[in-house]
Amino acid sequence: MKCVISGLKRIRAGLRAKLPTRGGSAAYWTRHMVAMDDWSDSNSSTEHFLWRNAQYPGYIDLMPVSFADGLVVVDYGCGPGNDLVGFSEFSKPDKLIGIDVSPTALATSKKRLALHGKSADLIQIEENRNQIPLESGSVDLVHSSGVLHHAENPGAALSEIYRILKPGGKFQVMVYNYDSLWMHLYVAYVLRIEIGKHDRMPLLDAFRKTTDGPNCPISHCYRPAEFLELVQNYGFQGRFKGAAISLFELELLPKRYAAINSRALPREHREFISRICFNHAGHPIVNDAVAGVDACFEFRKP
């Protein structure tokens, strides 16, 4: 396992030098904010929150927005405010703070929260500095969904998150999962072999082009053990809670037989797919975890 993790790190280091920045992540996410509706009222906003989470069965159980009553909550990488709405509707936090690199996302969050008669402290940070203008030890819960895998310097972000958390404070985070059908069935087989797209570039670079637009400057994926090691290096204690799977991945399941039968598909991917079994919900399991793209973790500051 350590050899595989070390190999992934070396590959990513090489890829980072080739990534198209086009003004950096902040500029990219301002131009390509996560898809949203033109919400007309609080009901349509809440329905969008519920609909979006339903696209990833199991996600909301792994990354809950309830049970945050009386807490100081930070949504790190809040985007257009989906989870800010979730916390404001399904919890009663003492204070709610949204942080993002995109001013457009923060402005959208403000307008969306206003539909609910709610507000939050909204803070723009610089992507290359990652400095959070909050006091050390002032936050109970940091929530970060689908953000750190886009960070140019995730270590700097983790260091700041650790600093602002109170002792015993919680950090719940979702990042893209290498051990997923998205990687082993969609990218490795459907995209590169069936369709013949991105088949001449490194696998991790092909993955990057499939998640948040083909020109997304940074989009890592991690094996759970690799991400645990990364975060624990910054003082956290925690665990891999499990993964949520996308409906898109579930729709691809019938292709698994052709993938296993393909001599063109590297053995790593064939073996991963051949180990699939199913849980009571009908979701594919590999290595005792749902083989979905959203890997979810829970950490605490000692």
Can you describe what each PLM-predicted range is?
Residues 70-79, 171-200:
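Conserved class I S-adenosyl-L-methionine
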Residues 1-44:
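N-terminal, positively charged/glycine-rich alpha-helical extensions of SAM-dependent methyltransferases
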Residues 207-208, 219, 224-230, 238-302:
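A C-terminal cap/extension of S-adenosyl-L-methionine-dependent methyltransferases
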